[in-house]
Every structure is written in structure tokens, then in C-alpha cells.
Amino acid sequence: EAMRKRLRGLVKSGEVVRVGRNAYCVSGNKMSSYRHEYSEEANTVAQALREAFPAVEFTIFELVQLNEFVNHQLAHNVLFLSVEDDIIDFVFDLLKEQFPGKVLLDPTPELYHQYWYDGMIVLNKLVTEAPRGIEEAWHTRLEKLLVDLVSDSLLQEVISKSEYPAILEGALSGYVIDESCLFRYAKRR
């Protein structure tokens, strides 16, 4: 128990990082755990969901999160909100009231482009057992972001395929990736 407690402390301080199930490595200067500072709008949406549906699981991915990795910077933000399937209609109704004209429910790529709006919220179904954020459960982990990028048809339309090598190289060379988390989520997708 003492060893487990010490290991948790080292992980929390960032001296050691988790790279898989029961697998850890000493954090070097070159690689770190992924963190993103969420926009005020993302925090507002998260707060509204926590207040209205305290037990619901959800994640928020901001399109501008990719700016760290892409060659051509994204000037406009879109929130991709994934929520549990059972409650998606209720969440849609809530957000539609609070953000009129800015919410799309599981749009096709054609609908996305037709109704695109800066600051738009795209609502879709959360894959069961999706990785939860480390600081906040609703934060999107890098592992989820990478898997969604190659498996979500809407994201494939939004992000140019020519950006994929830079995104993958930047993510894999700059951040510690929990491989078991990545592959487990990829199997679920």
C-alpha cells in the first residue's frame, strides 16, 4: 500500500507518467502529459451540463486544440460535445435554449458545412468507456483525440488529411501516450 501511495504521488507531481496499464516511466524534459486550456465557452457548456445533469458523462473537444499540432492554424473554434446516448436529446434541448442557432445534433459532413458557425457546438454520442480526462472528467485526453481523428467521419472532413502527419508526429514526440488507453478506446470505436 505504501508503494502504491508513493507511486500515485509521483504521478500526480509529474515526476512519473503512466504509459499503460501498470506501466510507468520517468518523465523527461522532452515529453510531458497533455494539457489544454479550455475556452470560456467550453467551460460554460461544461458548467451548464454539470448543473442540469450532474451524473452524466461527457467530453468536450475544441477544434482549436489541434492548433498546437497543425501547420495551418485554425482561426475558428467548434466545440465537439460527446454525451451518453440515453440523454443526448435532453442535452440537445438544454443547449438549444442556452445557445440558440449554435447547436447541431450528430450532423453529417454536408450539414456541418452548410450550417457551420464560429463557436458552433456539435453534439454526438459518447463511445462507451471513452477515456476520461485527468484534471476534469470532461476534458478530452490526447489518446481519445488521436483515435477520433482517424475514426470520426466528421472530423476527417473538417481536418485536412495533409495535416495528419504533423498532428501524429507532434503528439507522439511531445507527449506521453498511454498506449493501453489508446488501443482500448480504438477497439471501442
Residue ranges and their predicted role:
Residues 1-12:
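Short amphipathic alpha-helical interaction segments
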Residues 11-21:
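A short, conserved structural fragment
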Residues 22, 38-117:
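Short gly/ser-rich loop at a beta-strand->alpha-helix junction or flexible surface loop bordering the NTP-binding
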Residues 22-29:
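Minor-groove-contacting beta-hairpin "wing" of winged helix-turn-helix DNA-binding domains
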Residues 25, 80-82, 122-124:
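Residues in well-ordered beta-strands of folded domains
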Residues 30-38:
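Short, charged/polar, Gly/Pro-enriched secondary-structure boundary elements
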Residues 99-189:
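Hydrophobic alpha-helical interaction segments
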